[in-house]
Design a protein with these regions (language model features):
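Divalent-metal-activated hydrolytic enzyme cores
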Residues: 3-141, 149, 175-209, 217-432
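Catalytic core of membrane glycerolipid acyltransferases/transacylases, capturing the structured
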Residues: 139-171
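Conserved beta-strand-loop-short alpha-helix elements that form
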Residues: 214
Length: 432
């Protein structure tokens, strides 16, 4: 595999100084990290209990009080009752554990989704501050495409620490987003500015910002990188950049005024959650050999006072960006790097510096449209699609992943189908 060389912030070191309190960076959001850990633990534990509980229930299926005993265990360990019809005939035939497993996954997902929308545990609807900041930086929409790999499912709420409600997120395998769909979304946003003044008026000097997050592995770069690009991070970055440029060209060809579109490319280490950002120059061009590496910024600034650390982050971003880079883009990148410092410390504190599951460990496949409730790493593999035919490539990748995770153990592949519809359009629900 050919690995790209990166001219990042390697020239400076932390100078051997002692780390800050508890070894955390001075800009780390300690309260935020604690809240995110509680949520991650609660949700993943709910899914990970399913197999041990079903093993326990399976061993009891020929006892005289099996149904009552099984329900008691499920209620205590999983928090819900099992379908009675799945248990009633266990004394005659073997308990259908594959079917019961799938049902438990779906019920656990439903409970998680209900809690997410009812209680907003991640504070993702607190969007006003970010909306104002983005517009101050010169952007009226942040549209992010991470790879569909489940190891990037937490990219918005955890890795970048952005409120999910302020970001359009639509993952695709390899980060290869649908250009036509994105142009359509761009047109929808611009029409909203023109007709409604949302999020700002059409004459405001702001742009639509399209971002792609590609990924790589620092632990096992030859095998645990992006499967869609053969674990070649240089190929992943180039393919993402090519897709971004195709989007901009499409807007310019169809509507002229390419200045209304801005582009940004981010790399993410799926073992540490550290990001590297390829800052564009004033014309929107990005050099894949040039980036700002958050994990190196962390080392350089972790022993400073908070105000000094924030200023130094901004200096490092500017120093390692093209001279003609837009000031608003530099502000945004500095904020993303600063936010990522908290996630670097989160992985160090909670997961020992690197995730134990370097590869895939998704619990189910999410197929369709939507899924803003999925904000956790390695919980879901995404296959965004309107029809099976157009999403065949993403579905094939998901089938391969779950062939190793589930099918090899005799378990089915749980698939949650989700489709959002416009409630104001007559008949939309029935068509969905």
């Amino acid at each position: 595999m050919t690995r790209q060389t990166t001219r990042a912030v390697a020239a400076e070191t932390a100078g051997g100084r002692a780390p800050g309190p508890n070894g955390l960076h001075p800009l780390t959001d300690r309260d935020g990290n604690a809240r995110l850990q509680r949520y991650e633990d609660r949700v993943k534990t709910a899914f990970d209990r399913i197999v041990p509980v079903l093993k326990q229930i399976s061993a009891l299926q020929h006892e005289s009080d099996f149904e009552q005993h099984a329900q008691s265990i499920a209620r205590a360990e999983l928090g819900f009752d099992l379908p009675e019809y799945m248990l009633a005939d266990a004394w005659v035939t073997q308990l259908d554990l594959r079917r019961l497993f799938a049902w438990c996954v779906f019920e656990t997902y439903r409970r998680m989704a209900d809690d997410f929308f009812a209680n907003d545990p991640l504070g993702g609807r607190e969007v006003h501050a970010l909306d104002r900041f983005l517009q101050d930086c010169g952007f009226h929409q942040l549209d992010v495409t991470p790879c569909a790999d489940g190891r990037l499912a937490h990219a918005i709420s955890y890795v970048l620490r952005l409120p999910f409600g302020a970001v359009r997120r639509k993952p695709y395998a390899g980060g290869l987003f649908d250009v036509e769909n994105t142009v359509s979304k761009w047109g929808e946003v611009e029409l909203g500015r023109f007709r409604e003044g949302v999020p700002n008026t059409a004459d405001s000097p702001t742009r639509y910002l399209k971002t792609v997050i590609y990924h790589y592995s620092s632990v096992d770069p030859h095998h645990q990188g992006c499967a869609a690009h053969g674990s070649n991070d240089a190929a992943a970055a180039q393919a993402a950049l090519d897709r971004l440029l195709a989007f901009r060209q499409s807007v310019e060809n169809g509507f002229c005024c390419g200045a209304s579109v801005a582009l940004l490319l981010i790399g993410m280490d799926t073992d540490t959650d550290a990001i590297r950002v390829h800052v564009p120059d004033g014309e929107g061009r990005m050099d894949l050999t040039q980036s700002v590496d958050a994990i190196k910024v962390h080392a350089i600034t972790r022993d400073l006072e908070p105000a000094a650390a924030r200023a130094r982050v901004a200096e490092l971003v500017k120093a390692h960006a093209p001279a003609s880079a837009d000031p608003g883009m530099l502000r945004l990148v500095a904020r993303l790097i600063e936010n990522n410092l908290s996630q670097i410390d989160y992985v160090r504190q909670v997961h020992g510096g690197r995730y134990a599951d370097a590869g895939h460990a998704e619990r189910f496949m999410g197929v369709g449209i939507g899924f803003e409730e999925i904000q956790l790493r390695n919980l879901t593999y995404f296959a965004y699609l309107y029809t099976v035919e157009e999403g065949a490539a993403d579905l094939d990748v998901g089938r391969k992943i779950f062939g190793g995770l589930n099918v090899s153990r005799g378990l089915p592949i749980p698939i949650v189908i989700r489709f959002d519809y416009h409630g104001g359009v007559p008949g939309a629900r029935e068509r969905a």
